[in-house]
Amino acid sequence: MSYTLAAAYPSLGRHLPKLDLATLPTPATMHLLHLDTGSFEVAVKHDEATSNVYGGNKVRKLEFLLHRARDRGAQRIATFGAVGSNHALATAIHAADENLECTCFLSHQKGTPKIPFTLNMHRRIGTEIVPWGRGIEPLSLYREYLQGRNCWVIPLGGTCWLGSVGFINAGFELARQIADGAVPKPARIYIAAGTTGSVAGLVTGLAAARIDTEVHAIQVAD
């Protein structure tokens, strides 16, 4: 059983180059969950350990997206999110590590304790922050900040077919860990869902690796 789509399908993999930003495979461990209704075994895939730098499982997408940007000769990355967006900050940090400038279009969100940390990190690494969202005319904003700047745009949450390849790999990775006996084949998998690119990729990867299980997407953003 292969760990990645490229290993399983080499001819396809040659057309999907990526940067080495992630520490993979991430661990999969078993735990006993005690509830009033009884005790249950649950497996946990520790994708919080995907990057030693920052970003959790967002880095699975960024490996492919930032490689494509560099391959196309971009000098600046632009992406979108709320002011506390983990995706936006992860993109800015890893873009900076690849000597790419970054513009983040950030929209309002309800205050959380993490927002000051996130904004301070953006300032430390020199992210260009542009207010974005309701009441702002987007086309004029894009012309002002993107036109003529040799910019590569990464969609909200990194969700696009190329970003989802990172989670197709996650499906193959989990299938290999099941085959190796690290965890049993789960009856169902729960995954956080925002823009759902990770969900689409994981479902595709599990199907390609012939892991027959239910995938439940849990909404974490409005």
What positions do the PLM features span?
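PLP-dependent amino-acid enzyme catalytic core
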Residues: 1-222
